[in-house]
């Protein structure tokens, strides 16, 4: 490809277009990372990009969850090179969706989700043999739900934006899409193993309910830091500081 300063020669300006998903996209963009004020003036542009993405990818269209992928990408590319941020963001979206589409709970990939659920179970049991309870049929739908609730967005829907950026840094540094996907799976395994006692000692329904309540907190407080420890041990994360109220 040549040196980075020549990459702009390979880009082609994107021609925006509309799709049948405009209404849903508009709603989703307005409620994505609502606490992040940086995005507020950019939301119309994000709507336009998702709309264009859906119209170009006719067979895929727009699936809820894509909104969480495009926000962090847009911020990174816009702050890096605003002149080509649209093109770079949509190109990155295309690449991510090629990797993640099968994890979306659309129905056509139900067999793949079950297979991936089996992989998750096996990885968990390898680390903690007592987690063999996850192989019970009662947990099959739960494992599918765990995958489809976090993997399609690479955890962006259950993390604070700054933690999304930290986690994605570790995922994107993998050498290939396969390795990147495997790191995302490892992140899910870390989350499940961290709560192993729920599955080992509690009834199925109770375990699933408690786990669902703790997912966001555990990802924010433990799993992101653990992923950095494993994938980038040279990185040291500063603890978040809180400002005392007057």
Residue ranges and their predicted role:
Residues 1-246:
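Helix-rich, well-folded core regions that mediate interactions or catalysis
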């Amino acid at each position: 490809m040549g040196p980075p300063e020549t990459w702009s020669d390979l880009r082609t300006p994107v021609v925006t277009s509309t799709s049948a998903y405009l209404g849903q996209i508009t709603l989703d963009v307005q409620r994505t990372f609502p606490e992040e004020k940086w995005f507020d003036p950019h939301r119309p542009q994000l709507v336009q990009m998702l709309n264009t993405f859906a119209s170009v990818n006719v067979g895929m269209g727009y699936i809820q969850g894509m909104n969480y992928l495009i926000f962090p990408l847009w911020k990174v590319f816009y702050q890096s090179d605003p002149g080509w941020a649209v093109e770079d963001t949509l190109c990155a979206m295309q690449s991510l969706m090629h990797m993640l589409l099968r994890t979306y709970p659309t129905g056509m990939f139900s067999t793949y989700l079950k297979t991936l659920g089996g992989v998750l179970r096996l990885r968990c049991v390898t680390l903690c043999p007592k987690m063999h309870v996850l192989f019970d049929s009662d947990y099959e739908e739960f494992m599918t739900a765990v995958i489809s609730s976090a993997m399609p967005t690479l955890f962006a829907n259950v993390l604070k934006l700054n933690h999304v950026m930290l986690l994605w840094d570790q995922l994107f540094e993998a050498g290939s899409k396969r390795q990147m996907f495997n790191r995302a799976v490892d992140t899910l395994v870390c989350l499940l193993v961290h709560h192993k006692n729920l599955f080992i000692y509690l009834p199925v329904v109770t375990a699933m309910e408690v786990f669902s309540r703790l997912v966001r907190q555990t990802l924010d407080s433990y799993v992101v830091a653990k992923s950095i420890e494993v994938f980038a041990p040279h990185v040291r994360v500063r603890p978040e500081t809180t400002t005392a109220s007057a």
